Amino acid sequence: MFIDKVNISKEEISIYKKSNPMKTRKIIAVGGSPGTGKTTLFRKYMENKVFQPIEPAKLVSAMYNTERDLYILGKYEEGEVFAGTDRLSMAVQPAVQEWIASHNCNILFEGDRIFNQSFLEFAMGLPNTDLQIVFLNVPKQVLEQRYKDRGSDQSEQFLRGRETKYNNLLSNFDLMSYITEFPNTNLEEQGKVIAFLEEHLKV
């Protein structure tokens, strides 16, 4: 039996749930350069589903859906342009890994904070885990327009660094078989990514 202590609306409650430790749980990591639409995609996915903001472990904020036993890592507050794991502490990765290793719930996340080689290789080595890595692609000219539209102040050096990071991940031999790439320039393409998430996280 797993016991999760979570905070919901500042009221401390305990959730007791029987869970089969041998079940195959899903971890889906969504990455892409800044402006590829990760946060917008996740807000769309959460529409018409009931999620509660919780803190299942120290430093670890998430949105929890009981029906799917699904944690979306990070913060998603109204009106915030930057959300997801990018809103978490720079030091969050050890806490996230410790928590995930002791639970077999489903995990979905986006953002740069833990979308890195060490975390993905950690997830790849977890028992009874179906890991999927989704990479969003958007043409450079579309990205540049999106940066202008949202008033992004991220430097060219920062953006080049992120591009190099993702190129290295895409060429990582150990991770290749887990990666699915999607274009994400319009609503139709966004819908295909959401359909992928729905299929892999269905009840």
For every predicted segment, state its role:
Residues 30:
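Hydrophobic anchor at the beta1->P-loop junction of P-loop NTPases
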